[in-house]
């Protein structure tokens, strides 16, 4: 007879951290240059006017202004920054 109870082992018990993807600045919001607009994997949304694309496909503002999303049919969805009138 065993003196101690045999302990089972489980192959579960792991989970990865969320990647926190998605739109960070929504349409109509005012942003400053360098603000992250969208964190994404792949180019689900493409950069438009005054928007840059990082190496991980993150879209960011190149200038101060208002965020504007546009769906251009077969060309896809674009995000642009409309500069604030001085």
Curated annotation (Swiss-Prot):
It comes from the Bacteria. Pfam families: Ribosomal_L27. Signal peptide: none annotated. The keyword Electron transport does not apply. Gene3D superfamilies: 2.40.50.100. Coiled coil: none annotated. GO terms for biological process: translation. Keywords: Ribonucleoprotein, Ribosomal protein. SUPFAM superfamilies: Ribosomal L27 protein-like. The keyword Ribosomal protein applies. GO terms for cellular component: cytosolic large ribosomal subunit. InterPro entries: Ribosomal_bL27, Ribosomal_bL27_CS. GO terms for molecular function: structural constituent of ribosome. Belongs to the bacterial ribosomal protein bL27 family. This is Large ribosomal subunit protein bL27. It comes from Koribacter versatilis (strain Ellin345).
